[in-house]
Amino acid sequence: MKLLTAFSPLVVLILFQEQISCYYLTKYASSGYYQDADFVIGGLFSLRVTDGDTFISRSGVEDTSHIAEYVFADLIKYYQHILAMVFAIEKINKDPNILFNKSLGFFLFNVNFIEMKAAEGSMALLSGESPPIPNYSCRPEKTDKLVAVIGGISTSISIQISRVLSLYNVPQISYAPFDQILGTRVQLQSPYQFSMHTAALYQGIVQLLLYFTWIWVGLVVPDDMRGELYLRDITKEMISHGICFAFAEKVTEYSSMDTVNWKHFMERLTLTPVIITVGDTHSLLRIVYFVIFYNLSGNVWITTSDWYITTLPFEQNLIYTHFGGGLSFSFHMDEILGFKDFLRSVQPRKYPHDIFIRHVWSSLFGCPHYYQHRLWDLSQCEPNGSLSTRPLHAWDMNTSPYSYKVYAAVYAIAQALHEELSLRVEGDSSNKCLLQAPLPWKLHPFLQKGQLGRSTNEENTVNKEVSAIKLDIFNYQSLQSGTEAHVKVGEFVFDSHSVQHLSLNDKIITWGKHRSQTPLSVCSQSCPFGFSKTAVEGKPFCCFDCVPCPDGEIANKTDMDQCIKCPEDQYPNKQRNQCLPKIMVFLAHEDPLGTVLVSLAISLSAFSAMILGLFICYRETPIVRANNRNLSYLLLISLKLCFSCSLMFIGQPRTVTCVLRQIIFGIVFSIVISAILAKTFIVVMAFKAIKPGSILKMGMVTRLSNAIVCCGSIIQVCICAVWLGTYPPFPDVDMHSEFGQIILWCNEGSTLAFYCVLGYLGFLASLSLLIAFLARRLPDSFNEAKTITFSMLVFCSVWISFVPAYLSSKGKTMVAVEILSILASSAGLLGCIFLPKCYVILLKSGGHSRKKFFK
């Protein structure tokens, strides 16, 4: 292989520019697992976490008296990644049409999760042996056949591999979770990645949270650049859907937090029952250890397929106790046909050169362990042992997402080889060109246009013809058989047109050992009907207080941000969760108050008619004649009209009644007061006319009284005419004065005109009171001055009391106040002026004579 050039100084600079760990290239060097063939694919896998001193072994937590700073774990289930590659290569070799009867081999190394060991493994693939000699091909029979490399499992491992392979332009396919950072590193060749539509993943998580109404959640991400991007994107998506975080923590894969900080971190995990974790198994490995150490349980963990928690080597039920009931999202994978059968057939004697199967078998079947780093004794293992017999906590027969990526990566390389070899065959019919493996860099054009694309700042779709993306949702639950498994409970479909569909069978979901029902994950209890949310200062928007809706507003849903104002013609019920139609209110004839007022008005009107009839019958009696019969008739008729006009105030207000009732009231009352004023004036003028030498005649006094009545009434008519011509009364509604009622009332239009009418009546009444008061001592048996004085006092008292009562009342009460004022003042005039005369007419009419009258 003549790929190696004079890049040794550059290789050394790149590999050692960061002090990752004190690791020597020769420390525990492995020869790798090699299978010869015409073309060889390199594989760099991670089967063990060694971050320092032993903390946790396969049986669980070893020492619970303190928290170690380092962790150790054999990830036995990650051996499935290697088997997926072996299975894919064997399957390809069985099909002569893919590689034109050429075979495909592999060269595999375990780099754990150590970045320097990943660099060593990369150089071992280029050098042909381990420990490697940088920039030198020790085994050209191996290195000349290398066409591509698959690895690593994380971003940091992939970067170290890429730093070496990119110098020699060897294609690298990373099976790590998609990371935009891999495409932005300053290096010659970025690794190829399997695309992952993170927008679909975040949308799926959000829709799941909304489905269960989980709006108060925690978020845990790895403390690296990828975690920063996760945190930024998923936070933005969740906040836009009304979901907020109880906490957002970053977890380092190295020991950078002391015990106090870890205790504080564990306390924060108890703030909410639902925790979202976005990251891979290795980057979040430490949090698993501390959750078990602090015995934190009862949380619902929402994860992605990258955090394949069942791969961790713990004793039976230990993982399920703390993480059971969790939900995980995985991009839909087609089942690899024949892979489970292949796993059942895997045995050490079938693959005697597999250096990894020995450790796996000894762990799964209880064989003697590694002896002095050299010897293995598998004689005590089950001779016919099968991986399918192992429980879930030890081995998983289901294809993991990582295994699926490795399998797909092998086929992507095989497809690229097929296309490259096809070009050779077209140019050379003798097939001599197929004798040598193609140079690795020649596969780049085919990998770029195939299912895998170069990683850039934008994610590449695996299949550009398929716009819809489907995610499977799994629930980690315990089966009736006593084993634990990931059970598919739903799926989420997302396409480029933003069409989303979440289907979930929540009836088969279990929530672990500590919960029997769906957990409630909210910061504040839901605000019931009739209450709205108000923010709590210093807390996220999901934390709120519930306050009752103000008057006139309702909340007909739970957790309303603002109450809804009822329409003007409706009002809220007592619970303030529904708007009810307001009741139309006016002083109706059927109302008890309306009935009483109607009866009173009719009775008083009839009573005034009876007095009028009495006066007509006894019109020739001295007392009737002495008090000016015509004015008495006019006054009684006007009072009867006053009683009758009050009936127009009762009933639903209409345009005609609103206009006529105040106008008629004003004019009729002006006639009444003018007639009383004329009567008072006659009393005074009569005594002056009978004095010796007076120029006044009784006929002149009578004509003058008629003029007073006409003049007083005409002025009121003019005031009413101006009122009607400018701003007349009209029917109106009052929706706000009384709760739950719409008051139908007559708006007086011009308030000034209304009070001018009342003021003019007050002026006439005051003038009558003044004249009557001055004439009260005139010597006459039929002198009306005293009764008029008393009647005017009653009249003025009623209407003076009317003004404040009228202004302070609303609706039916306001109308009733005016009706009572009309009836009371009219009844006062009727009683004070005419009842004494009726008494005289009916009981003492015989004792009066004209002679006595003139005395």
From Swiss-Prot:
Keyword Membrane among record annotations: yes
This one is known as: Vomeronasal type-2 receptor 26
In this entry, the parts of the chain located on the Cytoplasmic side of the membrane are 617-630, 684-706, 775-786, 836-855
What the entry lists under Pfam families is as follows: 7tm_3, ANF_receptor, NCD3G
Q: What does this protein do?
A: Putative pheromone receptor.
Q: Which key words tag this protein in UniProt?
A: Cell membrane, G-protein coupled receptor, Glycoprotein, Membrane, Pheromone response, Receptor, Signal, Transducer, Transmembrane, Transmembrane helix
Q: Where in the cell is it found?
A: Cell membrane
UniProt topology in membrane: Multi-pass membrane protein
**Which source organism?**
Mus musculus (Mouse)
Hey, what tissues is this thing expressed in? Expressed in the basal epithelium of the vomeronasal organ. Located to vomeronasal sensory neurons that project their axons to six to ten glomeruli that reside in globally conserved areas within the caudal accessory olfactory bulb (AOB).
Grouped into one coarse class, the protein's main location is membrane
Q: Which family does it belong to?
A: Belongs to the G-protein coupled receptor 3 family.
Q: Which InterPro entries match?
A: ANF_lig-bd_rcpt, GPCR_3, GPCR_3_9-Cys_dom, GPCR_3_9-Cys_sf, GPCR_3_C, GPCR_3_Ca_sens_rcpt-rel, GPCR_3_CS, GPCR_3_vmron_rcpt_2
Q: What is any one of the record's Gene Ontology cellular component terms?
A: plasma membrane
Question: What transmembrane ranges does the database entry give?
Answer: 596-616, 631-651, 663-683, 707-727, 754-774, 787-807, 815-835
* Glycosylated position list: 101, 295
Q: Which residues form the signal peptide?
A: 1-22
GO biological process entries: neuron differentiation; response to pheromone
Keyword ATP-binding on this protein?
A: no
Task: Topology check: give the Extracellular ranges.
Answer: 23-595, 652-662, 728-753, 808-814
Q: Name one GO molecular function term.
A: G protein-coupled olfactory receptor activity
